[in-house]
Amino acid sequence: MATDVHRPLSTQKAATAAAQASTAAASAVRVDGLTRSFDGRAVIDNLELDVRPGEFVALLGRSGCGKSTLLRILAGLDRDIEGTVLVPRRKAVAFQAPRLMPWKKVWRNVLLGLPGKPERAVAEQALTEVGLAHRSHAWPKTLSGGEAQRASLARALVREPDLLLLDEPFGALDALTRIKAQRLVGELWQRRGCAVLLVTHDVEEAVLLADRVLVMDDGVIAYETEVELDRPRDITDPRFAELRAELLERLGVDTAAEAA
């Protein structure tokens, strides 16, 4: 069930509320006419977006185009907007910086923010799922970058999200750790079945993981394409390379010069 995190459905006219409820059942995310301005400048400008339940969507775009702002709005962290945003009640977000509390053991970090008094076993289960059970009693400062990011993912997973929001979660990782983290996220998504919105600058990562790739420019979704490639994706597949090149061109990268 989705809710409008910015404007209660009860304030809408009955017909509008009924239509939104129907749309929510068919969508994990529904955004209509979203505008977000800073100092009179629209960073997001009358944006429309749908994400289907269980769909993995990657969002590309140059720095400053509004990607992270959109993700923060979907997460409910920024509500100074115009327009309508419908998202699931159960959602979670993981950022590039894991944001672990240094004075709490890893398993306690995983449980941060959960209502009630969840048992340690809840954290242990999530840590096992991300391959970090052996570090549950460690202090965050002793974790590697990849381990810290996995702890952040575990903290998101314990919320049993219907929507997982990922804001460049692999950006600070070295190449090998990044590949492992990408594989882990893909496996978690297939196992959990939740909708995922991944904000990234990495075109190859987007094609590798997503069902659909969006390109954001000047505050709107300027382009989108389905990734009609079998899983697991093969980066040596000519169709993979073609789609990567097409997306790079949409982002203003001269692929002919890149090849040269």
UniProtKB/Swiss-Prot annotation:
Domain (ABC transporter): residue spans on this chain: 29-243
Annotated SUPFAM superfamilies: P-loop containing nucleoside triphosphate hydrolases
E.C. number(s) listed in UniProt: 7.6.2.14
Record field: transmembrane: none
UniProt keyword annotations, A-Z: ATP-binding, Cell membrane, Membrane, Nucleotide-binding, Translocase, Transport
Cellular compartments annotated: Cell membrane
Catalytic activity: ATP + H2O + aliphatic sulfonate-[sulfonate-binding protein]Side 1 = ADP + phosphate + aliphatic sulfonateSide 2 + [sulfonate-binding protein]Side 1
Major site of localization recorded for this protein: membrane
Primary enzyme class: translocase
Molecular function via GO: ATP binding; ATP hydrolysis activity
Regions annotated as coiled coil: none
Binding-site residues, ATP: G61, R62, S63, G64, C65, G66, K67, S68
Sequence similarity: Belongs to the ABC transporter superfamily. Aliphatic sulfonates importer (TC 3.A.1.17.2) family.
Function in brief: Part of the ABC transporter complex SsuABC involved in aliphatic sulfonates import. Responsible for energy coupling to the transport system.
Matches recorded under PANTHER family: ALIPHATIC SULFONATES IMPORT ATP-BINDING PROTEIN SSUB (PTHR42788:SF17), TAURINE IMPORT ATP-BINDING PROTEIN-RELATED (PTHR42788)
Quaternary organization: The complex is composed of two ATP-binding proteins (SsuB), two transmembrane proteins (SsuC) and a solute-binding protein (SsuA).
Protein name listed in UniProt: Aliphatic sulfonates import ATP-binding protein SsuB 1
